[in-house]
Amino acid sequence: ANPIQVKALFRRTIDTGIQHGTVTVMIGDDGYEVTTYRMDGEYEDHRHPKEVLFTPNLNEDLKRRDFTINAMAYNPRVGIVDLYGGREDLEKKVIRCVGEANERFDEDALRMLRGIRFAGQLQFELEEKTFLAIKEKAPTLVNVSAERIRTELTKLIVSKGSDKLLLAVETGLSAYFLPELEKMLATTQENPHHCFDVGHHSLAAISHINDLGEQAGFRTKERVMLAYAALLHDVAKPDCKQVDDEGIAHFYKHPEYGA
């Protein structure tokens, strides 16, 4: 059904994204988003299609999705509709693009960071071709707004798999939103107080602070603030490192420079 047909079927609706085919149907105090099957036109900026076309064909809608685990549907008559192996990838805990990974990332560069975020939240692995496509297309992330990148990064670092942020370094993606992280991972800490390099130490700090925040019942806003503090608390160490005559590393004034 197209948005006009959906609105005609229900007494109370809200046009939450009607230009993209989305109408919120209100039943009592609860809202349910109903989105018409869509086909995307040509993408012009590695982010947005020039036009969105409605279609009655579910297959056309599913093939425009980003990852196989997001390209399944359910019909009460036929059950799960799974044209791209999403169910198998769920069972194997794999993030895989629908169709050609390079094409999916050419269409929308944010999908690269979303894939890593899903890997963290679900504690899945990136399928090899998806990983390699992110590596190739990483420079196109410059077409994505800082706000959208921040949203994905925030969801990643407060997740159970926050250490999947390493995938952003391994693919070269972090160079376009957090270039300091690669330097942190390359900075060793030769002193009695640390057993990790700066980067792995910071990732471990995020993991611990997430666990503590969950145990303490912190609100999401508080957990986000603490996760970013853990991520960035040693961000200036690579530029402040000094090694004394005994081979001990010092990072004088790194908190001030980091702030």
How should these model regions be labeled?
Residues A1-A259:
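Catalytic cores of the polymerase beta-like nucleotidyltransferase superfamily
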